[in-house]
Amino acid sequence: MGYTIGVDVGGTFTDVVLGGTSGAIAVAKCLSTHYDPIAGIVAGVTWALGDRDPAQVTRVVHATTLATNAVLERKGVRVAFVTTQGFRAAVPLGRYARVEEDRYDLRFSPPPPPVAAGDCFEVVERVSARGAVLTPLDLDSVRRAAAAITARGITSAAVCLLHAYANPVHERQAAEVLRESIPDVVTSSEIWPEIREYERATTTIMSAYIGPLMASYLSQLRERLAEIGIRAPVHVMESSGGVISAELAARRAVATIESGPAAGVLAAAGTGFPDVISFDMGGTTAKACVVRGGTPEITNEFHVGGKGSFGGRRAGTGVPIKTPAIDLAEVGAGGGSVAWLDAAGALRVGPHSAGSSPGPACYGLGGSEPTVTDANLVLGYLSSASLPLTPDLAAKALDRLASPLGVSREEAAYAVHEIVSASMASAVHVVTVQRGIDPRGFALVAFGGAGPMHAARVAERFGIGTVVVPAHCGVASAAGLLTGALSTDRVLSRLDAPDPSAVFTSLTAEAAADLGVSPSDPGVVVTRSVDVRFKGQSHDLTVSWTPSREVLAARFFARYEEVYGIAQRGEIELVSYRIRLTAPTAPPPDTTPPPHAATPTADTTPPPHATATTADTTPPPDAATPTADTTTPPDATTPTADTTPPPDATTPPDATTTAPPDAPSAAPVAPDRSTLAPAPCPEDSTPSPSPPHFGAGAARRGTAEPGATRTAPSTATPSGAAGDATARDATAGDGAAAAVPRARRAYFPETNGYADVPVHTRDTMAGAPLPGPAVIEDAESTIVVPPGWTATLAETRAVHLTRSTTCQTS
């Protein structure tokens, strides 16, 4: 059997999904290792593979935040910018549009340009907008620029000459000379030959800025995977949702900046609903995207590194990237987002995140600031009986907010929950209401480790009556990678090209060569489109291509009216020609577990990298019984009274009938997995093993053969050295935490505070609707069903939340 592996590296967690043609699936979740991202990948892949032969892996598809983080943290390589004489200041001068956050800031200063003014160089040449050579390239000026660049110790250069999209000959000649002394040189005609000088320049600069990092990273990734026996091709997802080879991704690194969020949108598009709003909330950020007719919305320009980033919707706030990307709105709101009080004493949440180290206070890894995860634990939405969390630490953190606000702990916690839900709703607002889309006709597809806990509250703000939580929602982005097809985009600007067919043919041949296919191969699909504008206007709109000028004009008029709300007619002109070439891959694995699955054989083998020196001797918190969760959130007796015992009390406020998480063990040995009670994987803002021992790179695994899920945490020291493993084996479905429903106290304002609510898994709720308030503990997340909502389990094992008509109209 051949296997495909999807790997999604996020700001807090690294998710791995292994799919096979028979429908078997294994999932792993581990803390992202920011000091060495590949360490977390290897740990997760090792756990997901288990006893399977790594040589049977046929494909690894990867989505990474490496490029995004390099831009946001300004950790790329130093870049030299080479341009036409007289235009050196175009990029340093830049553009910036003030946003709400800094509109009245008297000390405001725009972000620094992507390249320093002293690192910009000019060469003598000139080409017209139609491609005619007005001044030949002076090669001596190129050599002088190369010498100056080398003298400064710069090893990466971006070449963007005026109107090179119309005639790239000078760029190619200049690059040839520069490569004699500079290792990494990219040209705008190679990266994205589209009209608009500033955007084309910044796109080229960003590719040179992150390209060497991406090339080194992907090379090391292939080497490290080969060390564990995986020699399959490594593919990387582009921002537009296509998948390309690692070699091509290294050359076109700028096209991978939004690869991680794109994978999640593909997963949302595959839920079976034609019109959905993708809602992905992880540990650091939340993303929203509109999918209409099963196809995600695409933008041809987005901004990265800006303040208050909303993807392509906050033009001017960051560095413009002129490549296709799934049109996302993103906010700094995740499970690890820190709650704080501003100078006026108002409660704020985010955008700063506790990340994976130290993480939320309840992790017990040294964090003390209150986060969204801590608030959800205090509210009873998370269980420390099945997850290795410390309620006392969460309570202490929330007290830091409650005391100055003059409210009770649970009121402060719910305020955090509401504020972060409102923040995430702003992302949904950007991609729907702000563009004239009524969200009430859409289903909200929630995934990511923290998304299902907040999805219903976000939906309520827009009158959305259906929320869909797909199977394996906590690793949906990694699962979406398995469905990605080989695909790439190309563009060329030609003002009213005399032979559009020849332009499309050239672009198609170029894209096919990059993917290693022929345009005539079976299953290869080429989608053509063109940018059209009214003559005399500078902004254009993209419409699908047709050779008929009249039909093309009609499509443009209709699109213009849809976007701007104005019916206008006039003479049009064609600006840029676009193609997307998609090549077939092996059929995607069926990652949906059947409703009734057999119990897998217990895996009692420690992971290959386990060592005895860093053994986790902590018994699992839920090892005593799989059927009772007597968790009581802190101060759960009333919505206003604080009855939480002090941190050093004998019994913690989230007491269970099991041994305490820090109970001593007779010997540092790994427990027998077959004797441990099953428990769900953590949501995307909580660690897997017990907090005192959980470090970066420790993985948590779930397997299904087919459909059954086994979750297995391991431990690792913060330096990445792995320790002995503990494991929990679930009996069926998505990691059922118990054979029968349980109950615990959770806070809902509709119930006037804390109330006993049922706690189910996808298996225990099968066959009957589950009215709220209720909690569904999933394999990698937790689904909160508020009052007025009803949960049902679909045949695809997706959980559907529907809101009562009375609630929607009230």
Feature map (PLM): residue ranges:
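Long, intrinsically disordered low-complexity tandem-repeat segments
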Residues: 591-664, 703-704, 708-709, 716-717, ...
